[in-house]
Amino acid sequence: MTNDRWQIHRHLAEQADQRLQIVKTVPRRILLAGADGDNSRRLLAARYPKAAFAEYDPRPECLRDAADKRGGSLLSKLAAKTVPQHCQALSAPLPEASADMLWSNLGLATEHNPVAVFASWAGALQTDGLLFFTHFGRDTLLELTS
């Protein structure tokens, strides 16, 4: 058994990223709802190198872990490629119409009021913005073990 905290997040991020192959829209601003050890941002930055990111999560330790995984190289800071992080509940209002894409990798798993989260996400997306999220379903365990 591995002690990799982000193994399931990484697996789901990779699966969701593969689905982006059919999307023709190139987002310029991506909001990450729920830190996942930088797995999602890394994949999205490779696919959309010109996109700007902002990351939201209510857990400061998860934000710290994502920032640590990114590293803070001098070159990335000079190129203004840092990722602003915001420690807040996912149901709290996000900046209005601020994103072309909102991405959440298991961000809903710990939320008690998903309706409020979806309302916040809807407000943050621009018209015709893209919402991608992963979540556990009825058959998740069967799919992950096969």
Where are these regions (language model features)?
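Class I SAM-dependent methyltransferase Rossmann-like catalytic core
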Residues: M1-P27
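Short conserved AdoMet
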Residues: T25, H112, Q126
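Conserved class I S-adenosyl-L-methionine
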Residues: L130-S146
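Glycine- and small hydrophobic-enriched segments that form the cores of compact globular domains
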Residues: P93-P95, L102, L106, Q126-L131
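Short alpha-helical
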Residues: H11, N39, E61, R138-D139
